[in-house]
């Protein structure tokens, strides 16, 4: 076994440099600023007052003996009542006033829901309309604001004058009339009192004359009061302008037309429903064949007798002999003119039975040259077998 030679001095220096390079981590973390500690901390804590970094043990103000601990003050935060954002309050003196002032400044500048920043809306001046637009649309004639639907003069029945509230003039007239009536009543009462005083002074001399005069004066005063009351009642009535009356009449006509249209539409819908229901009616028809067998099918109310005939010809089991259809085994058969009539018109709803009466084709073929108006010639024949006559 060969013995390893001890490392030389330059080799030892190279190893020490390599170890220093591998284990040196000063560029990653931060050392604690406490002189007795100086721990390398990879997640240091920064002090708010002295702006220095410390380890976990010395992060508190008292642990690292912070010099700026006297500068610390209590901080108060108040939420905004609109956006719920926290607002810092700097001074503690007069908290109520400072909080109100800070909140008002915040709402005027930084608040999200600031009313001054919100877009304005313009309401339509038409009474029946309640829409509002973000753009002001004025009429050229009456110069009042309307929505996009009623912006044209024909849509809002423009009169060419600015719109005034309909109750403004009548209220003013009623107030003036009431004031005038009150003044007239006061003057009348004063005159009555004067007349009564004069009459009382002259009662000793002319009792009869004074009584007559008093009665006359009282009657006159009563008449005046009645007239004034009647005038006040008449004046209290609202005097509408002519344009508003026209608008009221037009609105009534418009609503009456709408009612008439609705009633007509309801009638049409009822008729359509009746037609639809009638078309959905089903008639159950049973057919007894010449051999006594029975076939049955559900036909619609609008189906004709020809469709019944086609069903019989495609589903019969009694052969190919000619037949006539009857409602009774000994009754009159249906004629050719009744082929295009519906089941409802023939009275076969809701349930009915038809009988197939056999016919002799040879007799009908021989008698076809004669002009006999017998019922058998007009009877309903399903079809004739042309090969039967050429035996």
Curated annotation (Swiss-Prot):
Would you tell me the Gene Ontology cellular component terms?
A: cytoplasm
The protein here is known as AN1-type zinc finger and UBX domain-containing protein DDB_G0268260
Q: Which PROSITE patterns match?
A: UBX (PS50033), ZF_AN1 (PS51039)
Q: Which domain of life is it from?
A: Eukaryota
Binding positions (Zn(2+) 1): 32, 37, 55, 58
Alphabetized, the UniProt keywords read: Metal-binding, Repeat, Zinc, Zinc-finger
GO MF assignments? zinc ion binding
Q: Which InterPro entries match?
A: AN1-like_Znf, Ubiquitin-like_domsf, UBX_dom, Znf_AN1
**Residues that, per the record, bind Zn(2+) 2:** 47, 50, 64, 66
Q: Which residues bind Zn(2+) 4?
A: 139, 142, 156, 158
Low complexity: bias regions = 1-16, 185-236
Question: Does the keyword section mention Repeat?
Answer: yes
Q: Where is this region: Disordered?
A: 1-20, 185-240
UBX domain mapped to chain residues: 278-356
What is the species of this protein?
Answer: Dictyostelium discoideum (Social amoeba)
Q: Where are the zinc fingers (AN1-type)?
A: 26-74, 118-166
One Pfam family name is: UBX
- Where does the chain bind Zn(2+) 3? 124, 129, 147, 150
């Amino acid at each position: 076994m060969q013995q390893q030679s001890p490392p030389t001095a330059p080799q030892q220096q190279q190893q020490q440099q390599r170890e220093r390079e591998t284990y040196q981590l000063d560029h990653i973390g931060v050392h604690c600023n406490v002189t007795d500690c100086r721990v390398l901390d990879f997640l240091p804590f920064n002090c708010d007052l002295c702006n220095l970094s410390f380890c976990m043990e010395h992060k508190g103000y008292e642990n690292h003996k912070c010099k700026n601990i006297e500068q610390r003050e209590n901080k108060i935060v108040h939420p905004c009542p609109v956006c719920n954002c926290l607002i810092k309050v700097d001074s503690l003196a007069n908290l109520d006033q400072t909080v109100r002032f800070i909140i008002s400044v915040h709402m005027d500048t930084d608040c999200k829901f600031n009313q001054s920043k919100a877009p304005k809306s313009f309401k339509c001046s038409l009474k029946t309309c309640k829409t509002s637009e973000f753009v002001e649309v004025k009429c050229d004639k009456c110069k009042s604001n309307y929505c996009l639907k009623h912006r044209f003069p024909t849509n809002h029945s423009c009169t060419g004058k600015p719109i005034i509230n309909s109750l403004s003039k009548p209220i003013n007239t009623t107030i003036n009339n009431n004031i005038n009536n009150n003044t007239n009543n006061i003057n009348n009462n004063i005159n009555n009192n004067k007349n009564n005083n004069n009459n009382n002074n002259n009662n000793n001399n002319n009792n009869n004359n004074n009584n007559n005069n008093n009665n006359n004066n009282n009657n006159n005063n009563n008449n005046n009061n009645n007239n004034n009351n009647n005038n006040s009642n008449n004046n209290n009535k609202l005097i509408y302008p002519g344009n508003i009356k026209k608008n009221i009449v037009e609105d009534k006509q418009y609503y009456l037309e709408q009612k008439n249209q609705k009633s007509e539409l309801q009638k049409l819908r009822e008729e359509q429903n009746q037609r639809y229901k009638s078309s959905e009616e089903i008639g159950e028809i049973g057919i007894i064949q010449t051999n006594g067998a029975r076939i049955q099918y559900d036909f619609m109310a609008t189906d004709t007798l020809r469709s019944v005939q086609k069903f019989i010809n495609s589903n019969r089991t009694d052969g190919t002999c000619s037949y006539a259809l009857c409602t009774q085994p000994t009754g009159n058969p249906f004629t050719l003119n009744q082929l295009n009539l519906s089941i409802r018109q023939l009275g076969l709803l809701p349930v009915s039975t038809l009988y197939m009466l056999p016919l002799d084709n040879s007799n009908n073929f021989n008698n076809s040259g004669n002009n006999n108006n017998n019922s058998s010639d007009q009877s309903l024949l399903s079809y004739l077998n042309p090969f039967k006559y050429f035996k």
